[in-house]
Every structure is written in structure tokens, then in C-alpha cells.
């Protein structure tokens, strides 16, 4: 399955955000175990770097992006994606970019905690908890 993790899910995992990171990490483990085509929008890499550097430090930020690149295939944000995103997800152009890239890349599921994003998209969207429950996986208790 082609699965795209939204930026907030990556941040849950990397920053161990309370109340969210266990389900997000379990979803990641499940994608790895199932040999899914796990994807990340290229802009998420820079967003994660920026936030992790700010909250932790540059070394942790670089390690985080490197690990993301080991686990997920980056999806390019090119002119076609940028133009396609203009009418989508208003007023949030950033979500429009993710939506446009997901459509072009034929992503089957977007895993996100953003309840308002991607509602009108023809691609399934699920929270990390919904994703693992649907796949019959238990939340990893850490």
C-alpha cells in the first residue's frame, strides 16, 4: 500500500509527543512490517528539520531527517504540484501541496492527525489510531 505520513505524524514520533506518539510510532512500525511504500512530502523534511532544530538542536534535526529518508520515499514538490495545490485546501496552501502531491503520486492513504485536512480528497485519510485499528494492530506500549 502507498501510505503518506503527514508532517504532524513524523513530529509525534520524533518529538515523542505525549498522547500521540505511541499510535504514530505503531503506525510506522506497521508500515515497515507490511512493507508498505511509505512516503513523505519533501516539504515535510524541511518542516521537521526546522521544528526539531528549534525544540532540540541541529544534530537531532539532521538525524531525524536522515532517519525519515531511510524509512520513507520522498515525494517531490515540483511546479505541477504547486499549481495543482492552488485551488485545494483553502486557506491552507501547505495542505494543498500535500493533497496535490498525494493525488499525482496515487497515494492510497494519508495518515494525519489534522482532522480538518484532506476531507474532500478521493484518497483515504486516517488518524494513526484509525490506521492501526483498521489493520488489526495493537498500539505499542512503550
List the predicted regions and their residue ranges.
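Short, well-structured N-terminal submotif of metal-dependent ribonuclease cores
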Residues: 1-40, 53-60, 120, 129, ...
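Acidic, PIN/NYN-like endoribonuclease modules and their adjacent C-terminal/linker elements
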Residues: 2, 71, 100-142
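Alpha-helix capping/helix-boundary segments
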Residues: 9, 44, 81, 97-98, ...
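Acidic catalytic patch
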Residues: 16, 43-44, 64-89
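Structured helix-beta-strand junction loops
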Residues: 34-35, 71, 88, 121
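Glycine/small-residue-rich phosphate/adenosyl-binding loop
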Residues: 41-49, 53-69
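Glycine-rich anion/phosphate-binding loops
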Residues: 91-94
Amino acid at each position: 500500500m502507498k501510505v503518506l505520513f503527514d508532517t504532524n505524524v513524523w513530529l509525534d514520533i520524533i518529538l515523542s509527543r505525549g498522547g500521540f506518539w505511541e499510535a504514530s510510532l505503531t503506525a510506522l512500525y506497521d508500515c515497515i512490517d507490511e512493507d508498505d511504500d511509505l512516503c513523505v512530502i519533501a516539504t515535510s523534511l524541511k518542516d521537521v528539520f526546522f521544528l526539531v532544530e528549534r525544540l532540540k538542536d541541529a544534530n537531532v534535526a539532521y538525524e531525524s531527517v536522515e532517519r525519515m529518508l531511510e524509512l520513507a520515499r520522498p515525494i517531490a514538490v515540483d511546479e505541477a504540484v504547486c499549481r495543482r495545490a492552488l485551488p485545494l485546501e483553502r486557506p491552507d496552501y501547505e495542505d494543498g501541496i500535500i493533497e496535490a502531491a498525494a493525488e499525482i503520486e496515487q497515494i492510497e492513504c494519508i495518515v494525519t492527525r489534522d482532522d480538518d485536512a484532506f476531507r474532500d480528497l478521493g484518497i483515504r485519510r486516517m488518524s494513526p489510531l484509525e490506521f492501526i485499528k483498521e489493520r488489526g494492530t495493537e498500539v505499542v506500549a512503550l
